[in-house]
Structure formats: structure tokens, C-alpha cells
């Protein structure tokens, strides 16, 4: 399960950024995941819940925004969404398409409680 190593790095990055901002606690993390990123949301959530137990991210809400796959035909330049025959261009029927969206996986934003706020 590669989600474990992905989530470990994700947590390190999130905690480091929160510490830079002098945050007291991380409350929400907004992630962007492309349709073809090969990342399973439920697995990331499960790993995050376990790995974040002794960190400022414990109990933080993970939100996922899915980006649909989009392709560009290398023959005619037409762009099109994924479908039943994702790699076949619907315009020229060519089989030479490249993925131009849908491979993303990144942190969109982190919401924190700063040190100046009281509990």
C-alpha cells in the first residue's frame, strides 16, 4: 500500500508548514487528487488517522477535491475528458493521446489554529 509512504510524507510537510506558521493545531487539510493519480482516499484517511495521533494534526479533517482526467490528442491537438475509450481521440480517432490533467496530488491548503488563540 503506497498510501502509507505518501501519507507519511504528506504529514511531515503539513506539520512543517504549520510549525513555520507558529500554529498550535492543524484543523483541516484540503488535498487535490487527480482521477489518475492512483491514490485511494480511504487509505490516505486511514493512514493519516493512525500516523497523526501524536502530532498537532491529530483529529484534523481531510478534504479531497477530485480532478477529472483530461487528454490531448498529439495528432490533432483536440482535448477531451476520459471516457469509455479514454486514449482514442473522439475527433480524429487517433490513438496518440497524452494526459494533461488528472495526475495531480498536492496540498491545496492547511487550516490551523495559531498560538494566540485560546482553547
Swiss-Prot record:
InterPro entries: Hydgase_Ni_incorp_HypA/HybF_CS (IPR020538), HypA/HybF (IPR000688). GO terms for molecular function: nickel cation binding; zinc ion binding. Ni(2+) binds at residue 2. PROSITE patterns: HYPA (PS01249). GO terms for biological process: protein maturation; protein modification process. Keywords: Metal-binding, Nickel, Zinc. Zn(2+) binds at residues 73, 76, 89, 92. Pfam families: HypA (PF01155). NCBIfam families: hypA (TIGR00100). Belongs to the HypA/HybF family. Involved in the maturation of [NiFe] hydrogenases. Required for nickel insertion into the metal center of the hydrogenase. This is Hydrogenase maturation factor HypA. It comes from Dehalococcoides mccartyi (strain ATCC BAA-2266 / KCTC 15142 / 195). The gene is hypA.
Amino acid at each position: 500500500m503506497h498510501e502509507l509512504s505518501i501519507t507519511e510524507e504528506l504529514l511531515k510537510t503539513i506539520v512543517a508548514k504549520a510549525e513555520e506558521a507558529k500554529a498550535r493545531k492543524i484543523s483541516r487539510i484540503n488535498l487535490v487528487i487527480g482521477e489518475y493519480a492512483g491514490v485511494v482516499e480511504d487509505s490516505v484517511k486511514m493512514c493519516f488517522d493512525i500516523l497523526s495521533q501524536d502530532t498537532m494534526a491529530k483529529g484534523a479533517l481531510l478534504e479531497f477535491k477530485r480532478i477529472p482526467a483530461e487528454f490531448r490528442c498529439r495528432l490533432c491537438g483536440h482535448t477531451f475528458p476520459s471516457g469509455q475509450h479514454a486514449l482514442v481521440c473522439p475527433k480524429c480517432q487517433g490513438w496518440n493521446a497524452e494526459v494533461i490533467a488528472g495526475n495531480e496530488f498536492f496540498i491545496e491548503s492547511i487550516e490551523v489554529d495559531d498560538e494566540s488563540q485560546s482553547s
